[in-house]
Amino acid sequence: MISAKSVKELRERTGAGMMDCKKALTETDGDIEKAVEVLREKGLAAAAKKSGRVAAEGLVKTYISEDKKSGAIVELNCETDFVAANEDFIAFADALAKIATSTSATTVEELVNEKFDAEATIQEALTGLIARLGENMTVRRFVKFSVDNGVVKSYIHGGGRIGVLVEVACDVESPAVEEVAKELCMQIAAANPLFLSKEEVDQDSIEKEKEIYRVQALNEGKPEKIVEKMVMGRIQKYYKEVCLLEQLWVKDSDKTITKFIDEKAKEAGSAIKVNRFVRFERGEGIEKVEENFAEEVAKQLGK
């Protein structure tokens, strides 16, 4: 019988989870020292101790199926750019993107419970990687696309700093469709649109923008009778900044993205439709902890 006291002591010594500690003690007939070794071998002690540390570095990776009908984008985080450049970390991120493309999982929690290989789940394999490389790591997010008629395309910029996944539909197979998908990936990486079209912009966002522009115009001393006209002009400019189909093409500022797509649709002999896109930027939204080097050294020396 494994006592609660033994489980508590093992948790305090290793930082591993309660169920992992209980399992290790059961395997070792209650021998705490042997249980510590079991947890270390499994990487659970090291992984648990590191799990509280901020992981804001890492890689964004993508994978596209051979038939170009499906693909996935993932973000795998670690603590430093040094580990992000490690071959094992890169290989894990690549494998993760490939698994995400064919999985039925819809959440990260479901994804990490998928099989990584014949021996382990993704979470178990990640735990082992954490133990080997000595940093906290997390599978932060993933998105997968698939299309029956059309292509899924991806683009990685800056060695895994930014990743884009695009789904384009067309009833015919044509080099023009792939060209559209490729150029859209580059556009999204560079211009960072927030929406696909004007119709996707929620009304609350528009009303907030209108109010901001209205106050700005009044503060500039503009007559009230022309303020509304100015506001609508600025809203149109806002659409061109945040909506992919309204943006000017980065390769030719005389064309909007919509015009570029229409031209390619004529080449293909069929309508080309952008179904959806996603853009990941490594670490976006994660608050990094800024360490004071002198304080860190003093802490290490016990001062």
UniProtKB/Swiss-Prot annotation:
Q: Where's it mainly located?
A: cytoplasm
Its localization reads: Cytoplasm
Keyword Cell inner membrane listed? The answer is no
Q: Which SUPFAM superfamilies match?
A: Elongation factor Ts (EF-Ts), dimerisation domain, UBA-like
Ranges for region Involved in Mg(2+) ion dislocation from EF-Tu: 80-83
Molecular function terms, GO-annotated: translation elongation factor activity
Any Pfam family the entry gives: EF_TS
Q: Name one GO cellular component term.
A: cytoplasm
Instruction: Return the InterPro entries for the record.
Output: EF-Ts_dimer_sf (IPR036402), Transl_elong_EFTs/EF1B (IPR001816), Transl_elong_EFTs/EF1B_dimer (IPR014039), Transl_elong_Ts_CS (IPR018101), UBA-like_sf (IPR009060)
Tell me yes or no: is Iron-sulfur among this UniProt entry's keywords: no
Report which superkingdom the organism of origin falls in: Bacteria
Per UniProt, the keywords (alphabetical) are: Cytoplasm, Elongation factor, Protein biosynthesis
This chain's function reads: Associates with the EF-Tu.GDP complex and induces the exchange of GDP to GTP. It remains bound to the aminoacyl-tRNA.EF-Tu.GTP complex up to the GTP hydrolysis stage on the ribosome.
Entry similarity comment: Belongs to the EF-Ts family.
Q: What is this protein called?
A: Elongation factor Ts
Instruction: Please give the organism.
Output: Clostridium botulinum (strain Alaska E43 / Type E3)
Q: Which gene does this sequence derive from?
A: tsf
